[in-house]
A protein has these predicted regions:
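Sec-dependent bacterial lipoprotein signal peptides
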Residues: 1-18
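Lipid interaction determinants
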Residues: 17-154
Length: 154
């Protein structure tokens, strides 16, 4: 009986060693085109929730959501990215670390930030330091993690 228990434990050990808590960064980021869902404040980063900035319960919120949900971001496996926003596109680079879930995004050139929504988008991207999510939902947050931008695939 004792020998049997030891054998079972030895059989389980390789599975325990193979566990990996590191994210597959490419699977998450480079899984297609991402679209903004909303911006969130009063965030509880660990519980993945917050207070949506734009709400469909009023005309101003509906108009903002109509605009920002068309903003897109495509992360490519080679570390480049392409984004779309109101009246323009931009390119840049990205880098993420799956172990500590950090992200760094650089926007090349001078993207069109003449609209408040464009500026908000670019600022959220360039200030992002942390990410969480999977191949369906992606959240990017600044250092304090008190707010975040959330993306989804259409």
């Amino acid at each position: 009986m004792k020998l049997k228990s030891i054998l079972y434990m030895l059989m389980v050990l390789p599975f325990l060693w193979s566990c990996n808590n590191e994210d597959d960064v490419e699977e998450i980021f480079a899984s297609g085109t991402w679209y903004i869902l909303n911006y969130y404040g009063k965030a509880n980063w660990d519980k993945r929730n917050g207070d949506p900035k734009y709400k469909a319960t009023n005309a101003e919120g509906r108009k903002a959501l109509e605009i920002i949900t068309k903003f897109s971001l495509t992360f490519k496996p080679d570390g480049t990215l392409v984004g779309g926003m109101q009246n323009g596109e931009f390119i840049g680079t990205w880098q993420a670390d799956g172990k500590d879930r950090t992200v760094h995004i650089t926007i090349n050139g001078n993207p069109n930030t003449s609209s408040a929504h464009n500026k908000e988008f670019i600022d959220a991207l360039t200030n992002a330091e942390f990410y969480q999510g999977d191949s369906n939902v992606l959240q990017l947050a600044p250092e304090d993690k008190k707010s975040f931008i959330q993306f989804k695939h259409n």
